[in-house]
């Protein structure tokens, strides 16, 4: 299946990607990466497997267009990554946890889109601010109940010694 496929995406200190079936017959000016086999693979996240250097993973579209996080049926990547310090990893933990509040807020706001549009159309700034305050309070309360993201000791050891892509 993969014989003669090209590594069509190479990003220094991050990953190399292959598996586009169109790359088998592509000329040297072809844009690659869009080929597929007509199916995806359901998301499978196993905590003991993470994006350390050398990890093999199935490629997928971003969460914004792929909320189920399904993987490509044919494309894959190998993590090349780079090394990170413990303080960099600690900062990433903080950023990831802070971003979670925004994600929760946005999820809640999407449920109120009709209401938001009506208030915008009516120039109801007081109503918009009240709804924003309410959603921020709800997002914060929901966030406080969630388990916070934290790198495991194994992840810290790998990312500080051999490297990887901890942001994935």
Language-model features, listed with the residues they occupy:
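Cyclophilin-like peptidyl-prolyl cis-trans isomerases
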Residues: 1-168
